[in-house]
């Protein structure tokens, strides 16, 4: 298969060369230039020569009347040349003679003043050899892609050929730049030139767009004063004053603003200070909403010093016992919460929720996944809920965390359940008769605990006996509790506590008494075991007496 490659029309078209020079000039000045070049690079002469390149077909992928795609091997060794002009800044002290190592010569070397020299470079004897992918279409032009570095060699001639080191430097620098130019910029240049030959309508469209861009002149708003100019205080200026300012200097002229524009800006600022939904439109202005440190809600909020509130609820036949570790009342008094509160709610809330006081969520009471392990047994829940059922109806259901009540606690003549702690850690309700059968003795070391809790426990320490028991047996505990209440109210003053708080304190003191009782019984049962703990230390830790030298 053979085809003709006509090279002569390209070498004879003057408009083709003119456009090629413009494209090459743009491509050479696009990339960053070396610091030695202080001016733009201009392509003054460009000629493709009379010798066409040699093409060898390796593969044809698509072939039709209006399109072609294939892979070629191209070799070129013709008479094409390219001439460039620019200006360089030479440093007379730096001679580029690398006869000495760089670490022995002082750097940088500079002259007192820069020396600018015009430079003309001619590229000739260009030899190319590369594998190219060629895609042609009458609608899209010619696309050329190099698969390898096409430049083999070229000759660089300049005005500094008489200086050997300058000639070598220019040869190395221009070869490196030309390789990058042919790999990156040359395919785009060839594509634009092919559009000019086969698709002139597309080129005319691009030229028209560039002409429109060049016709648009930038308007300087400060070049001429506004018609209704005002000074810094907002007062209108006379045309005579404006003309005098324009003649004397331009600094004050640029500081003049239009009264109409200032009025618009003033309305825009006022809309931000009020609740008006109307925002005036200012031409050529971009509106951007930016939240400052005052507008951000997180910046103004402070982190509470107390721990987050813990809410635990269990549901049992429509009733629930909620243990609430509250910090609202303690924060009002300026102190940390001292003890938990026991609240009986007649609701069917379930789940275990942990919610922070500052970031409370609406789903805080929802049951979560095994984040908190309940170590209590189910019997504790049933017992606590049954105790809440037997309480008096006079204590109304309260959902708030802190409840204020009077000092007097109404006593129910009905049977009052008693909390007992057995060895199996079960909560049971026993009668007064069973309690009287146990040996009565004071608890050991009651002064170790908080005096407030100890005093509060005395109010419930004596149980109430059923109606069937004699009144003589119940008279003494009742009097004792009443006397304790009077002395406690005189000593501590008025306070607000719910019966649930008192019951919980009594239960805590009950547990402490049982623990102390067990420790005491254990010591009485095996006193020798505890005496061994107080033995003298082993001999290894005793200080050895020093013997006098004989």
From Swiss-Prot:
UniProt feature, compositional bias: Low complexity:
300-310
Q: What is its main location?
A: mitochondrion
Where does the record place the region Disordered? 294-313, 358-505, 519-550
Locate the compositionally biased regions of type Basic residues. 364-376
> Which terms in the Gene Ontology molecular function aspect does this entry carry?
lipid binding
Q: Which GO terms describe its biological process?
A: mitochondrial genome maintenance; mitochondrion organization; mitochondrion-endoplasmic reticulum membrane tethering; phospholipid transport
CDD domains given for it? SMP_Mdm34
* All residue ranges annotated as the SMP-LTD domain in the record: 1-208
Biased composition regions of type Basic and acidic residues, renumbered to the chain: 481-495
Entry keyword set = Lipid transport, Lipid-binding, Membrane, Mitochondrion, Mitochondrion outer membrane, Transmembrane, Transmembrane beta strand, Transport
Q: Does the keyword Membrane apply?
A: yes
The record's subcellular location field reads:
Mitochondrion outer membrane
InterPro entries from the entry? Mdm34, SMP_LBD
Nucleotide-binding keyword on record: no
> Which ranges are annotated Polar residues under compositional bias?
391-407, 458-467
Protein purpose? Component of the ERMES/MDM complex, which serves as a molecular tether to connect the endoplasmic reticulum (ER) and mitochondria. Components of this complex are involved in the control of mitochondrial shape and protein biogenesis, and function in nonvesicular lipid trafficking between the ER and mitochondria. MDM34 is required for the interaction of the ER-resident membrane protein MMM1 and the outer mitochondrial membrane-resident beta-barrel protein MDM10.
**Assigned protein family:** Belongs to the MDM34 family.
Any domain commentary?
Lacks alpha-helical transmembrane segments, suggesting that it resides in the membrane via beta-sheet conformations similar to those predicted for other outer membrane proteins and porin.
Q: What is its quaternary makeup?
A: Component of the ER-mitochondria encounter structure (ERMES) or MDM complex, composed of MMM1, MDM10, MDM12 and MDM34.
The protein here is known as Mitochondrial distribution and morphology protein 34
Species assigned in the record: Pyricularia oryzae (strain 70-15 / ATCC MYA-4617 / FGSC 8958)
